[in-house]
Amino acid sequence: MSKGTIYPSESLAFKDARTGAEIRQVTTTFALHHHPFFIIPAYDDEMKRLIFVSHRTGAPQIFVEIRVTGELMQLTDRDDLSEWSVHPSHNGHYVFFTAGTRGWRLDLETLEEVELVNFAATRMREEGMVGAAMGTTALSHDDQWWAIRYNVGKEAALSVIDTETGVYETILQRDRIGHLQFCPDDSNLIYYAGPLTDRVWVINRGGTNNQRLYARNVEKNEWITHESWIPGTRELAFVDWPNGIRCINVDTNQERQITSFNAWHAICNPQGTMMVADTNFPDIGIQIFDPRDNDRKPKTICYAGATSVGEHWAGPFPYADGPIKVYAPQHTHPHPSFSPDSTCIVFTSDRSGHAQIYEVMVPTGIW
């Protein structure tokens, strides 16, 4: 099939066997599917479309579910898509992605693809399956700025692109850059992950004030990972695997504990009132909790049933002496994230033998 092809709805409804939560399976075709990485929204703000990647044509392509009809539409027909780079705009007009060494803006009405930038880089991401190797990108909440990392020789580079003109500025070059995220309350502030032993960094959009926000405790052999912003607070949350989630304020450096269970990939809703996380070793289901109140216990909303491959997560921090090769296919991880209106949570699961996309409804009055 080709760009613009419409597929009938594949939606199936059922209830979680253990929690009774209402779940909708969005895709059913026997192929690999996944929504964007958990730090990237899967919907536009008005929830007209759910954006995802499907391998049903033989290569990863961008698809949407048109939510008013349930139909699926293929948006791209490429052989060079970087499938974890996909980032929908908040206003619902575009999807941004990288392919080859170029950055593209796709119009969701006309399906026109406009090349915004060509880095002519040796490669756009690191080798492997995790972290900087995923090639995720970041879009400011006003949709004006798009941040991309790529390689310049042996170094990583961070560039910020004007989404209208394609004019860009390279604001940082260093040993390792990944998992870029604009602060939801400040389009001039970007989080990025540095080396695995020194991850938590922030930088201004213009390249000034590049600083370490949190220093890993080497004596405790801390495993700091999967950082995400808490809207409305200027706090950056991070997983202290497997001991829970802490956060730190970028202005005051005040730190606090959010929760103490084995949260794996965790992200807030846009309002900053709820947080969701998948779990592993052991998998105790997808959990919802309040990032503002660490005394409130998390609640299990459903069980994704994903294989969550990545045996290195079962032991202590494995990167103390440098990067190691791991096997952790990302489409086997649930990566839950909220819809803009917080009524549902999207996740991926390969429970059926193929990675499919699901939505679970957030119970009303959960608190």
What are these regions (language model features)?
Residues 36-40, 82-87, 127, 132-137, ...:
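Repeated scaffold domains used in trafficking and secretory/extracellular systems
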Residues 1-24, 149, 157:
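Blade/loop signatures of beta-propeller domains
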Residues 243, 258-314:
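Loop/turn-rich, solvent-exposed surfaces of beta-rich toroidal or solenoidal domains
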Residues 329-367:
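Blade-level signature of beta-propeller repeat domains, shared across WD40, Kelch, NHL, RCC1
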Residues 51-57, 95-108, 137-139, 143, ...:
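Beta-strand C-termini and the immediately following turn/loop, strongest in propeller blades
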Residues 32, 36-39, 59-100:
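Blade-loop segments of beta-propeller domains
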Residues 14-35, 318-326:
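A short helix->beta-strand "capping" segment at the edge of beta-propeller domains
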